[in-house]
């Protein structure tokens, strides 16, 4: 039995609140159960120096957690003078995931900066960030289209979403919360496109290796979960 009482293939309740920020070109407050992440997309009419005059744009991402997003207060990373390795890993993952579904030349020499700030954490912050960041990116591109800067369908090639899966209490489960994640025998994150393409798989065994059969079970849970998330994304941006 999962601590939450969910079935093995049952995700937490997922919601997207678009236009959460009145300042950002695109924004979304995404909720995966008790994990809440504010995702914003900010347009800059320039690209990094190494991309200048290259005829294409760029998507980059930053990730952070508010000090009291967790059970005990954490120090702001800015106060320590450097980002943790975990933070750097996650924000690079978010950027890679979004770039996988963007035609960078069609964006022009512009940069969109994605900021994912975890307001409340209960497991799956990176997967929620990727899934919500796609909504923010979509709305930023719609903002640009309304000003005759781009055509969304030329820039945004597909959906992208992410979900965690793991082996908990000897069962393959989807969308782990903190209690499950902290006790999981295997923990994996899957990033996939709406058309079923794999962007990234991260999997780690804790204590004992996992089998090919167990991985296949996790993969199927991820495919089904991401299909559900993409359907929710489509519903959100259609409203």
Swiss-Prot record:
Q: Which Pfam families match?
A: RNase_PH, RNase_PH_C
Tell me what reaction this enzyme catalyses: tRNA(n+1) + phosphate = tRNA(n) + a ribonucleoside 5'-diphosphate
> Which GO terms of the molecular function aspect are on file?
3'-5'-RNA exonuclease activity; tRNA binding; tRNA nucleotidyltransferase activity
Q: Which InterPro entries match?
A: ExoRNase_PH_dom1, ExoRNase_PH_dom2, ExoRNase_PH_dom2_sf, PNPase/RNase_PH_dom_sf, Ribosomal_Su5_D2-typ_SF, RNase_PH, RNase_PH_bac-type, RNase_PH_CS
Q: What EC number(s) has UniProt assigned to this enzyme?
A: 2.7.7.56
Q: List the disulfide bonds.
A: none
Print the keywords alphabetically: Nucleotidyltransferase, RNA-binding, rRNA processing, Transferase, tRNA processing, tRNA-binding
The EC category is transferase
What does the record list as GO biological process?
rRNA catabolic process; rRNA processing; tRNA processing
Positions with a binding annotation for phosphate: 86, 124-126
Q: How does it assemble?
A: Homohexameric ring arranged as a trimer of dimers.
Instruction: List the HAMAP family hit by this protein, alphabetically.
Output: RNase_PH
The family line of this record is: Belongs to the RNase PH family.
**Its biological purpose:** Phosphorolytic 3'-5' exoribonuclease that plays an important role in tRNA 3'-end maturation. Removes nucleotide residues following the 3'-CCA terminus of tRNAs; can also add nucleotides to the ends of RNA molecules by using nucleoside diphosphates as substrates, but this may not be physiologically important. Probably plays a role in initiation of 16S rRNA degradation (leading to ribosome degradation) during starvation.
Which protein is depicted? Answer: Ribonuclease PH
Q: Which organism is it from?
A: Sinorhizobium fredii (strain NBRC 101917 / NGR234)
Source species taxonomy:
Bacteria, Pseudomonadati, Pseudomonadota, Alphaproteobacteria, Hyphomicrobiales
Encoding gene (name): rph
């Amino acid at each position: 039995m999962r601590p939450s009482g969910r079935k093995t293939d049952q995700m937490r309740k997922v919601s997207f609140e678009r236009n959460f920020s009145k300042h950002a070109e695109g924004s979304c407050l995404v909720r995966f159960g008790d994990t809440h992440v504010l995702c914003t997309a900010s347009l800059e009419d320039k690209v990094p120096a190494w991309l200048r005059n290259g005829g294409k744009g760029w998507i980059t991402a930053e990730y952070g957690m508010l000090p009291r997003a967790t059970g005990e207060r954490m120090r702001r990373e800015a106060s320590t003078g450097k980002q943790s390795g975990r933070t750097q890993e996650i924000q690079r993952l978010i950027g890679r995931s979004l770039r996988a579904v963007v035609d960078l030349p069609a964006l022009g020499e512009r940069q969109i900066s994605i900021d994912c700030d975890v307001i409340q954490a209960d497991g799956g912050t990176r997967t929620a960030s990727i899934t919500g960041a796609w909504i923010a990116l979509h709305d930023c591109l719609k903002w640009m289209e309304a000003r005759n800067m781009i055509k969304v369908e030329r820039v945004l090639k597909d959906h992208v979403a992410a979900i965690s899966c793991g082996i908990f209490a000897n069962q393959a489960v989807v969308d782990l919360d903190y209690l499950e994640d902290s006790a999981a025998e295997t923990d994996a994150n899957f990033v996939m496109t709406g058309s079923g393409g794999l962007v990234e798989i991260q999997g780690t065994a804790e204590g004992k290796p996992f089998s090919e059969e167990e991985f296949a079970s996790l993969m199927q849970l991820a495919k089904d979960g991401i299909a559900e998330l993409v359907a929710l994304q489509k519903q959100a941006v259609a409203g």
